Amino acid sequence: MSKSQQPRHLKLGAMVHGVGHGWGEWRHPNAQPNASTSFGFYKQQTELAEAAKFDFVFIADSLHIHAKSSPHYLNRFEPLTILSALAAITSNIGLVATVTVSYTEPYQVARQFSSLDHISGGRAGWNVVTSWLSGTADNFGKAEHPPHAVRYRIAKEHVNAVKGLWDSWEDDAFAYNKQSGEFFTPSKLHALNHKGEFFSVKGPLNIARSRQGQPVIFQAGTSEDGRNFAAENSDAIFVHVESIEEGLAYSQDLKRRAKGFGRDPESLSILPGIRPIVGRDEAEVESRYQQAVELVTVEDAIVALGRPFNDHDFGKYPLDAPFPELGDLGSNSQRGGSDRIKQLAKDEGLTLREVALRFSRPKRDFVGTPEQVADAIQTWFERGASDGFIINSVLPDGLQYFTELVVPVLQQRGLFRTEYTGHTLRDNLGLDVPANRYSVAAEVEDKQEALA
């Protein structure tokens, strides 16, 4: 039985986002304004998540900033560096880093993630992004930012090359025979010799596979190109959805596409990002919710709204007029997100102010007492709208409240583990170790010769 055929269990990841996802969260009285460059903060958050038996921690990234970027992105750690440090102080929790394909080389990415995979004992995950902010091109000496469709062609070739490099060494390649002097078996080392539309990579990679075979592939795809890429290549998908109905439709669509690519759809984990606010009783829930609401100003919400539209300046439009007609603006940045915003504004006849606050203020879906938040999580999971969630804390102590109050309820209901049962990120997520392509080919050849 493959791991994907075993009984379903809820999966949980923690987004560690320094001073917060939004523009105003750093102003909370208990917030640590330098959290995004504080190893102590990342250590504390990761230890909370591991103590609660989370599957992984997740570090987002961006390679372009400007004066109005959110505080976290203005001054923060590079993901692979901070995760390598966290690997040394953790034992079981997965470590997922965001790295772009549009401004990196496959050999570089393959080597970096393999190194993290070895340092952590097989707990690395790669969140594949194509980078939607056009200003990124200016930081890498590029004349222009690749168009949306081209970025996904780049992504497919890049990821295929990286996976090929990860298989450079068969699992038993290193003989370490001191008596004979054979350090490795030459026939078990393989050059990739890839030559494609965007990349030329000879290989082989100068580091072996880890105990989990290859790092786990994450991706966030909502556009048509993004959904197809995720369904074909990803092990787990990070997604933003507005409702359980939207989550169910997305999950069904992605798993249908995965099956079309010849994959077991149950091996694919759909993980919506949520921003839960938890209180011990109704009064504390309302108090904490209002704290979060008060951190979002209309001015900040207008700036935040521009991000999926390639940092478009919405400040030039009347706040209380209907949401402006934008044509195809956003189609070459975060297409799925910008299209969803435009469609929602049109369907509900919203003003610019209403749209901005709708997407910046915390939603009520996962706001409540521990039992109420657990109820919402259980409903989404059991209806098939998600296979788990990525927890993005709104308040400075949000992850602590969630791990100490909600996780025990989920455990009591048999939805979430009480102990780790494996050692790798693949173990945590119920994923099989991918076979080395060259070992598989050799086995097939041996069988054919035996039958000849």
Describe the role of every protein-language-model region.
Residues 2-20, 149-212, 245-248, 252, ...:
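An alpha-helical appendage that flanks or caps ligand/catalytic pockets
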Residues 6-7, 47-51, 83-91, 117-123, ...:
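Acidic (Asp/Glu)-rich catalytic clusters
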Residues 10-14, 57-59, 93-99, 122-128, ...:
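Hydrophobic faces of well-ordered beta-strands that scaffold small-molecule active sites
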Residues 12, 49, 53, 86, ...:
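Conserved, mostly hydrophobic/aromatic
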Residues 25-40, 98-108, 143-145, 149, ...:
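Active-site mouth loops of central-metabolism enzymes
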Residues 70-96, 259-261, 400-418:
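Alpha-helix-loop-beta-strand connector modules within alpha/beta enzyme cores
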Residues 89, 94-140, 146-149, 154-158:
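Hydrophobic or amphipathic alpha-helical targeting/insertion segments
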